[in-house]
Regions:
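An N-terminal assembly and electron-transfer interface module characteristic of large anaerobic redox
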Residues: 1-221
């Protein structure tokens, strides 16, 4: 199992209204096998903070950054350094009281601003976008949605440097099965090579029965 580094950073929370959820998230991550939680030393209160934190996370080889929207801070530039980095980004939006309690902190507005900015940047970042999650840590869908991203990133890390072989051609007309091998390599580090059936049969026939039997004995099923 590949080790994964998860960075956690929050926007400014001067009234400490998000402290309980922040701590609950940290506690929940302790139970996720193979994940190292890296907490930012600073909150985000503007684009300069975001740049500094994204750089610090990049220096520590963070794979996934969770940006906790405690309040509406800055503008769309806040998310840009994270999107330009090698980190994947999840924007976490928290529910707020609708009938009573403290003044709204515009968490959803903040999340919408950041994810929209990331989407606008997708052309210059090879299609990279930010994923959003909504809810409290104890909600039934919040953590599973995040964990699906963690599993996907871990799978991609495990596949880096691997070689996939497509044997034979894609049947004519199945244009939906076409892909760009170079783009796959650039995005995931996976090499794709193509081999015809004729090449497979030729190489099979060139192997002696003794060598084939010896090789079969080394393959674990």
């Amino acid at each position: 199992m590949k080790h994964l580094k998860l960075g956690l950073v929050q926007t400014g929370d001067p009234l400490k209204l998000c402290t309980d959820q922040y701590n609950a998230f940290c506690d929940a991550m302790k139970d996720v096998l193979g994940v190292e939680l890296i907490q930012s030393e600073w909150e985000i209160n503007g684009a300069e903070d975001a740049e500094r934190i994204a750089t610090a996370f990049e220096a520590r080889a963070v794979d996934l950054t969770v940006l906790m929207c405690c309040s509406l801070v800055g503008d769309g530039r806040v998310i840009q350094p994270f999107i330009r980095s090698h980190q994947e980004v999840v924007v976490w939006c928290l529910p707020e009281p609708t009938r009573e309690g403290p003044l709204l902190l515009n968490s959803m507005t903040c999340a919408n601003l950041y994810t929209s900015s990331a989407t606008q940047m997708s052309r210059e970042t090879g299609g990279k976008r930010a994923k959003w999650i909504y809810g409290l840590v104890e909600d039934p869908l919040m953590m599973p949605r995040l964990l699906s991203s963690i599993r996907a990133i871990r799978a991609r890390k495990s596949m880096q440097g691997a070689t996939l072989v497509q044997v034979g051609k894609t049947a004519e007309g199945f244009i939906n099965l076409g892909f760009d091998a170079e783009a796959i390599h650039d995005k995931s580090g996976v090499n794709v090579v193509f081999c015809s059936l004729e090449e497979i049969f030729r190489d099979m026939n060139a192997v002696s029965d003794a060598d084939a039997t010896a090789l079969a004995g080394t393959i674990a099923c």
